[in-house]
């Protein structure tokens, strides 16, 4: 599915080595948790896996293609939910119209279903939402793209206790045998019930 092969990464400014000769394989049909303190390299690994960062050495292979190539056929089958992001002040319907075409397997029906897990609906304007609400909408969109690889960086940050419970049900409902989900967290108890493996 996706393999990390002898990966090394160093931040240029600080010269801090984050990963050195790191290898790992992720299988389909599994939810993986990347557990570690802040600054341990969890986010860096997710960005390397998505091709948004370039390793000093080694490579990440997704469907037998190096993610550094950023090919459309690769990008349409992976989705990264960063810890911090901005959404435009437009209606959710407009946002979906603008962005769903990049993901051939996007399902509006799935989007509605996932929003319901968070007690939200389609008739909302993104500019009027709190950060926690924006996160719920963006995660719902991410899962509704039906990509085979979903990367999530600290997705429960900013969610209250009911929101974290909703998140666990949301992830469980979106899993399938051909999907791999990788979640970084420093609070494993928030998501331990949905994880197949903790790394």
Residue ranges and their predicted role:
Residues 32-37:
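The feature captures the beta-strand-to-loop junction immediately N-terminal to the Walker
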Residues 164-177:
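Helical segment within the ABC ATPase nucleotide-binding domain
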Residues 150-154, 159:
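Catalytic Walker B motif of ABC-type/P-loop ATPase nucleotide-binding domains
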Residues 80-137:
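ABC-family P-loop ATPase nucleotide-binding domains
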Residues 1-4, 8-21, 28:
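A short, flexible loop at the N-terminus of ABC-type nucleotide-binding domains that lies
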Residues 50:
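Helix-to-loop junction immediately C-terminal to a conserved catalytic motif
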Residues 58-69, 73-74:
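Conserved ABC transporter NBD signature motif
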